[in-house]
Amino acid sequence: MTLIKLDTHTIDQGTLPCTDLKNPNSPELFTYNRDWLLDRFEEGMVIIKLDTSKDAFIEYVPAEFAWKPIHAPGYTFINHVYVEDDGPEQWLKSELLQTAETNNSKSNGMVIMLENKDFNRDRDFYLQRGYLEHAHIPGFTMLVKKFKTEIPVPAFAMPISEKSNPLNRHGIRISYADQSAFINYYIHEMKVIFEDMGFNVEMHRIDTPENARESGSPYGTFGVFMDGHFLTHKLLNKHGIEELIGSLDLNEMYPEYKYLIAS
């Protein structure tokens, strides 16, 4: 099996799917912007593909340049391990993970953040390969494999939500990174839908790893907030947004609401 390292010279050898932010209207996966990838290469990102007929790649970066809410100096952060139809043995996925670990054996260790549904699916895969379930924030689990013993362990570095501001009611903030024209299309579709529902919408572009860490979203590069309260990191169509808003306990989010009405 041939391993292909993508860099500024080999980036055009196939596309890379964005496996986290999926099209809300179809199962089709997005692909990253070429310029986005080139900028990430400058930050030390590495992508290794397997020379197969199906998508199979691992993407990792020095944790200091991870666009995620983590603090893990000296570690290597795994953005994605993706294999299309790997089969129950997951040997292609294991090959990619082992390659990344070997390439980064002089670092403090490896860190990966998984959505809880992915963690529940892949828990045994990572635990059997020496990763420890280390920390949690709502919806996400951090796994760590240390290569050195007496070093600080990684940590989440973010506020999940902020105190609501009763003077700025019905405000939606959409924070996003410019990863893909397709993703940006759906983000702006969400903006229109929220505005049609009567919300004031603020768009905030995330343009550095530091911004992503401080965005307030556990996903880092995308988040939707209502008056400072984190709502979702998912791309949603109109039906999804209506379900999201309908599921909120506004009395819990805004305990001062009745007082404001009475005054």
Feature map (PLM): residue ranges:
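Conserved active-site alpha-helix within GNAT-family acetyltransferase domains
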Residues: 116-139
